[in-house]
Amino acid sequence: MGEKSRRKGPAPRHADGKLGRTCDHPYAPWSFTPSSRAPTAWVRPPCPVWASRLQEHSPEPRRARAPPTRRAQAALYAPALRLRDHLDRFSILMTSCTSWLQAPQAPGLCRDEQSSRISVPQLSGAPILLPDLEGTKLSNFQESSPLPHKHERKDKRSTPEEEGRSAPEKIIQSLKLCPGGHRPASLSSGCPAGCRLSFNLPPSMLLSVQKCCMPSSLKTC
């Protein structure tokens, strides 16, 4: 069977039946060759650079960086120039947007350009309510104004002349026909549907209609 060994596992054997031991230590693993018994061809000589560094025990001093070339400077400063160009373009766009906001949105509706301008407080999202409109139910608006995706028309008696009119003219005409024009349209029962529809208009047109609803300007509107 062979000699017993303190090493784990079966003992490797050569073809001639002898144990293949490379180290005489009893606890050394099989095929373990210490550096003292290894051939000289297996041992690589240490790198002279690393050997000198290990002997010195001091890091190599860093070299001073050379100034960047013109191409590197252009690459560094190019994004800043591009950002400045974009900022100029954004300022032009903002100027055009503010000028558009100050332009009259519905001139000729009540024959007053100043009343149809959009001001900054109106763009803040605050609700714009007509006088005596607080406390009214939302169903008053939902009954008279169908959803945008419903194309059915409730009033089938409209003539081609009424279809050709613009929305502000229809609203003003309904305001003239509304009994008791000084009262809010949603509170009057005999008021046509177009009068209640006026509260779903944009803020600029809503203010124009509000001015038209006043008894003093109802005659000239």
UniProtKB/Swiss-Prot annotation:
Comp. bias (Basic residues): 1-11
Region Disordered: start-end pairs: 1-23, 139-169
Top-rank taxon: Eukaryota
Signal peptide: none
Biased composition (Basic and acidic residues): 13-23, 155-168
Name listed for the protein in its UniProt record: Putative uncharacterized protein LINC02693
